Amino acid sequence: MSDWVDKQNSLVSRIIDGSVTIDSVTKFEDLLEVFPSDPELHRIYAGLLQKEKSLDAADAYGRAAKLFIESGMTLQAIVCKIHEWKIFEPSQSERQTFHSSVGEGEYKDGVVQRFFAGMTNSEMTAFMTKLVPMNFPAGSMVKRFGDEEKALYFVVSGALEETDYHRLEPGGRIQKKSTKDLIKDD
């Protein structure tokens, strides 16, 4: 039995990291019956439905957001809500319910959760409408040295290497200062 569970968990991990894809809605639904509480699988399923132009994607993103909140993963829940609300505009009651859920419970990403929970409902809603979920392929450069600072990035999944540069003297050569790995929830 343990061998079967290990294989299933390995498959789920590979689906989540993108090394295995399922393009069949029916097969994905079968997988969700086995793993009904995995928020990442629900998010990927919602993305598949959205790609298929199914309005059911909104419900799937909502379910994923709920599971992310229950798992203490605020940022992932917010991204799911952004996708859901782009399909169907939420009512004021739905916005308030989501805002309240962000402010409750223990969270793995305390800093991000406190950032959003510290906002009023209208502030959080206004901020969320400005957020644009983006995917970057592995190895791509998000921002080049010298680019104008005009965006705020949140790492929702995966990892990012941040490299800071500075000049040794005014007008002198640029020297590499340091690198720092940013992971999800940074």
Predicted regions span which residues?
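Structural register within alpha-helical repeat arrays
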Residues: 7-11, 27-31, 44-45, 57, ...
